[in-house]
Amino acid sequence: MSETIDTLETLLIINSGTGVLQQCFVNFPYPITGAARWLRDIGFCLWILEIVLFGFFTGMLAWRYITHPVLLKKNMMEFPTSSFLGAIPISFNTIIQGIISYYDYRTSARWATFALYWVALVMSLVISFGLVIYQMSHAKPQKLSDVAGVWVMTTVPLFVTATTASSIVPFVYMESTKCAIALLVTGFMAWSFAIAEVTMIVTIYFFRLIADKTPQAPLMVGSFLPVAALSQGAYAIQRFSIFLATYIKNGYAPTQVNPPPLSQATLLATSEVIHWMGIILHLFLIAHATFWVVQGTTSILMSLPKLQFNIAYWSAVFPMASYANAWCFLSRDLRDDGMRGWAATMVMIATLLWLFCALETAYRGFWLGSLFSAPGLEDWLGDGEQEQDEKSRGGRKDAWNGSYTMPPPGSQDEESGQANGHQSSEGDSRRRN
């Protein structure tokens, strides 16, 4: 794995951080009315910026893979940096969340988000399951030191998709109960899959931090990425619990008849229990995320002398914005002033971090021209051409990664008895006869 990771794939993480930050302004813990509504307007501007960046970067990435198909294969086998492809469904999901945040009063917007959700779900499954399976079956053998926080990006898309489902389900419920239940079930299943996957990945990553030397300086910022997964999961499960509690409170019971077989008091008590279960799970996951915030901050402070700005810094914006957004929603639900203040502080930190990365990216990338690069791109293209050449000449295909290996010079001659200019005895006898 290269020491720098300023490739086109990593640029997509800019969209993810921008998209979640605009959600922080939408869910800001203090009432947004009157003059304070400018926060929501800033969030809308960030949402438009995210759409533009998403179209630009995704279009560039698609063009690269269309013109050079070998790069897609090579990138998917480059563990763990191939996990940055997870930024595509993440950004797509935050765009969907923006639609329902700013146009929730429109029926067309509700149905549009419902349709786009299924596209996002398929994209997330391709990354969270397809990419992992591909890495298991095709990537080179890895050492423990190769594991980095970037690997968590394979499971974050499912969490963000669950967040999308939890955000749009109350509005789709206004149009169709069946569609809302479909969102609830599939969104909760995505959340459950993501919980199982992130538990395994984070456990391996934590063991790697203890048992092996610290990651390379450019990859240290990836220590924050577990924060993104856990924070998105916390936000999603609380919103699911609120919707399910409301649904039960309105008279639903599993053995549905009219009137319901359970009393209204029982339904109200059940809905309150479910709501508080969501809050407890939120607190559990956000506490776990807080541990990784402390761990990531400590790692960055210890590596400051070696760190230079690169696109990987955006890997900290997305997790911190997700962390702030989770606290914002929790503080609004519990109506606790202390939590509101903490959530507002985290939003400010995430905003300052976004501004720092944006200014550094503009200065180093567009002014100095020293930021955007694709290390090893020429080598990858050359390797692809060499593989095609070896394939055409009858090279042996390696099963573990699909590449071709040519036999040593003269080996085929030795097998037929013709090495070093000597012919086989069988051939000599034919000529004598």
PLM region spans:
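Intrinsically disordered, low-complexity terminal tails of fungal membrane proteins
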Residues: 1, 377-433
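Juxtamembrane membrane-interface segments at transmembrane-helix boundaries in membrane proteins
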Residues: 1-5, 29-44, 72-83, 105-114, ...
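N-terminal signal-anchor module of multipass membrane proteins
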Residues: 1-60, 67
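The first (N-terminal) embedded transmembrane alpha-helix
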Residues: 6-28, 87-98, 152-167, 195, ...
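Membrane helical hairpin/interfacial module
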Residues: 36-110
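C-terminal functional regions that serve as terminal interaction/effector modules
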Residues: 58-60, 279-299, 315-402
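Membrane-interface helix-loop-helix junctions at boundaries between adjacent transmembrane segments
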Residues: 73-81, 100-156, 166-191, 210-218
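Membrane-interfacial loop- and helix-cap regions that link adjacent transmembrane helices
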Residues: 168-169, 178-182, 187, 194, ...
